[in-house]
Amino acid sequence: PICTDRVVASDIEHPNDHTAPSEPTITFVEDTNPKDGKLNKAENSSDGDNANTTAKISIPTDAVVGDVIKYTVNGGAEESHTITNADKTAGHVEIKVPVTDGQTSSVTAKIVDQAGNASKEVSGSIDVDTTAPKVDVETVTPVDTNNPADGNPDKGIVKGHSDEPNAPVVVTDKDGKIIGTGTTDDKGNFEITTDPIKPGDKVNVEVTDKAGNKGNGEGTAGDIEHPNDHTAPSEPTIT
């Protein structure tokens, strides 16, 4: 009888390759408006998935098809992704990262080549803030500054409060035109001087937090005030 032995080749060994690949970079693709390391509600909603955001792990130029990206998400178990031709062409891979309002989401990543050499591990994180500020408009006052008063408002004063201190405030009229700007104080209070407004005019007050979330409140102008008119009218005559 003739006996035939079959030998199956094992994986290629690389005994002389001791060079680690370059490290990747990590970016969060929804962090765009503004790009500040914070994820606001509008950014997180841009792809319709409010439970996750997308992280992009770059593929360095010296990484090749068959090398492995090892990564973790939010401190979880290490996962592996073998680089494909499509990945190499794109120059990156994308992974889903769960997000929770008020918490920080994080990713670590490194490249391991086919000789087992590992790049430096890099990390990236994003602070998640998807809660808009609360805005309470307390008074909207037309002001006639003339002495004597002529009944025509020269400006408006809008007062209120937000739960966001030291934040920009924008006041607009019913048509969306900006009529005043300012900032909340360290307790969240604001007093904004505006263009002239009349009794009954409606205004919108928008407060933007540090993550870019926008909160809104509305108010209606009351009666005209005349703070500078201290002149008594002439007395009448009686006949």
Give residue ranges: language-model regions.
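Short proline/glycine-enriched turn/loop motifs at strand-loop junctions of beta-rich domains
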Residues: P60-G66, H161-A167, K198-G200
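Hydrophobic beta-strand segments within extracellular beta-sandwich modules
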Residues: V107, V203-V205
